[in-house]
């Protein structure tokens, strides 16, 4: 009987990616199979996020529930990973001594040996260090789970925004070598992946080493990924306005695989608040980037992050944010009330705003974004859209579900063999959270670009023999 693994994931797409790698790693090393039933699990892993308020208490609340399972089944291994583990490792060890393994985002590759070690140790096994980007060298080959996939291209952030814990929990920016990224994507393409989402806390700061000792920029990486046959759609998240340079914008002019949708967090429309956040750009500079993007790709749609109620935010500061939202005409946003994160400079800033005012501002902001998003959706009525078919519709299992470039879900009637392919549909109805389409043509009738086969890309990748001597086929 196979051993069972349950992974509970909170937080960003990087955490989702890390959790998938944990599952692959433990399956390859020890034969663990995933389960969603806690009572079945031999190993319970909690992959945590420390961005939001009360993240630590949320962790201890979940661990308390798992302790009940461990009391009934003493052999169960409980592990805590992610950013809360990095920040609060000692606290977890003290407050929850029944936790067996504590690991950080950069040490998840050590999970098999840490779990094994914990089974012969009375004390929790903990490693929350930052060993550069070693974890990517220790992970098994990627396994595709559908036509879309996340691929991490870098880790950490070196910007040190005053409200953010990422530099303290994931370390500073470290880029994966270019060959490693391309090899992973080629492996996924061979398994039927059609869309990749390149991940990092600040992907446009990517500077990956090349086989000949050079450096590959993010713009160059995007163009290389686009040449891999089968990869017909590229997304990336998240970006920083400071390094959204003209060479990246130029990729939107000549690389159709790069989607007409961009998540570019601005956080506030007030220059005063941006300075307090240590965001080294102004609202006007942000709008200048958007103007250049829309010149390169007129149909591009923009989403952002916003923090409402930052310490010292006045009504004028908030109205400056609302003006930026209207001027840029954002399509969607992730918006939150400021919550102080322990150890960050902003946690010590005085704040005299009432919770009521913060909630009112958040509601006003979200209503504005929602109205803009609905207007964009209505403008799509009657248009032709190319969608990647992801699987059965969640509303009707007899129908299919796909996604447009601008992240709209489209439900339509079609045969199951279309799953994993691109189709063109006509949008015939608009709903708050989805669109309805009618099938116009399938992939066989399209002229999708073919450049480099996945096997060719893999053959070009840097290799080391048993002596560690590297070779590269140009």
Curated annotation (Swiss-Prot):
Stretches the record annotates as Disordered: 455-474
Presence of the UniProt keyword DNA damage in the record: no
UniProt cofactor note: Binds 2 [4Fe-4S] clusters. One cluster is coordinated with 3 cysteines and an exchangeable S-adenosyl-L-methionine.
EC numbers for this chain: 2.8.4.3
Entry's Gene Ontology BP terms: tRNA methylthiolation
Catalyzed reactions per annotation: N(6)-dimethylallyladenosine(37) in tRNA + (sulfur carrier)-SH + AH2 + 2 S-adenosyl-L-methionine = 2-methylsulfanyl-N(6)-dimethylallyladenosine(37) in tRNA + (sulfur carrier)-H + 5'-deoxyadenosine + L-methionine + A + S-adenosyl-L-homocysteine + 2 H(+)
Chain ranges of the MTTase N-terminal domain: 3-120
Compositional bias (Basic and acidic residues): 457-466
All residue ranges annotated as the TRAM domain in the record: 378-441
Signal peptide: none
Location of this chain's protein in the cell: Cytoplasm
Keywords annotated in UniProt: 4Fe-4S, Cytoplasm, Iron, Iron-sulfur, Metal-binding, S-adenosyl-L-methionine, Transferase, tRNA processing
Binding site for [4Fe-4S] cluster 1: 12, 49, 83
Domain of life of the native organism: Bacteria
One GO cellular component term: cytosol
Residues that bind [4Fe-4S] cluster 2: 157, 161, 164
Task performed by this protein: Catalyzes the methylthiolation of N6-(dimethylallyl)adenosine (i(6)A), leading to the formation of 2-methylthio-N6-(dimethylallyl)adenosine (ms(2)i(6)A) at position 37 in tRNAs that read codons beginning with uridine.
Description of how the protein assembles with itself and partners: Monomer.
HAMAP family, per database record: tRNA_metthiotr_MiaB
Xref: NCBIfam families: miaB-methiolase, MiaB/RimO family radical SAM methylthiotransferase
Family named by the database record: Belongs to the methylthiotransferase family. MiaB subfamily.
Protein name: tRNA-2-methylthio-N(6)-dimethylallyladenosine synthase
Organism of this sequence: Vibrio cholerae serotype O1 (strain ATCC 39315 / El Tor Inaba N16961)
